[in-house]
Regions:
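Bacterial N-terminal signal peptides that target proteins for export
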Residues: 1-12, 21
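An amphipathic, aromatic/His-enriched active-site/gating alpha helix that lines ligand/cofactor pockets
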Residues: 7, 18-35, 56-74, 94-136
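Short, structured motif recognition centered on aromatic/hydrophobic residues
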Residues: 38-43, 54, 88-94, 134
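Short acidic-aromatic low-complexity motifs
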Residues: 45-51, 97
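Acidic-and-aromatic substrate-binding clefts and catalytic sites of carbohydrate-active enzymes
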Residues: 49-54, 80-83
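A short beta-turn/loop motif at secondary-structure boundaries
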Residues: 79-85, 124-126
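An acidic-aromatic pocket/loop used at catalytic or ligand-binding sites
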Residues: 106, 145-146
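Short, low-complexity, Pro/Ser/Thr/Gly-rich segments in the mature regions of secreted, periplasmic
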Residues: 138-145
């Protein structure tokens, strides 16, 4: 129940943040607003003390690989408080379709340079406590981002 409420809260916050981001910074949100897209909300749970390493990997490497594979980020968030604020990273990516998402993730995961980065980032211990969770979202007819 707590996890479900957290996800609902995060999804609501992300939609609101997307709206605000679209008003303040039209790129890449405007691109993501193209009709027919599907949105993927990914939640990463880091091992205790490893959230800074996960964020560094995203900041320093992952975003570049996303760009390489035409994966546009909408935004990244961590919970504002509570125990999950120390271990959780949430972000949203738009995709033209689920099939495109699957193809992009396959290319991303198979990239030898990404594999080196992922391995190097974990020399001091495994970063993730579990596999990332992925939820695909369809925009509502009244959503400012579609």
């Amino acid at each position: 129940m707590r996890t479900a409420l957290f996800r609902i809260s995060v999804a609501t916050a992300l939609v609101a943040a997307g709206y605000v981001a679209g008003r303040l910074t039209p790129e890449p949100v405007a691109e993501a607003a193209q009709a027919g897209r599907i949105f993927e909300m990914r939640t990463y749970t880091a091992n205790e003390g490893k959230l800074p390493a996960l964020q560094a990997r995203f900041r320093d490497h992952t975003l570049g690989f996303f760009k390489k594979y035409d994966m546009t980020s909408i935004g990244y968030w961590v919970p504002a408080d509570g125990p999950t604020s120390q271990t959780t990273l949430v972000y949203i990516l738009p995709h033209p379709s689920r099939e495109a998402a699957k193809a992009n993730w396959a290319k991303f995961g198979a990239d030898p340079e990404w594999q080196k980065v992922a391995a190097a980032s974990q020399v001091d211990g495994k970063i993730l406590a579990k596999s990332p969770e992925s939820v695909f979202l369809n925009a509502t007819d009244y959503s400012p981002i579609k």
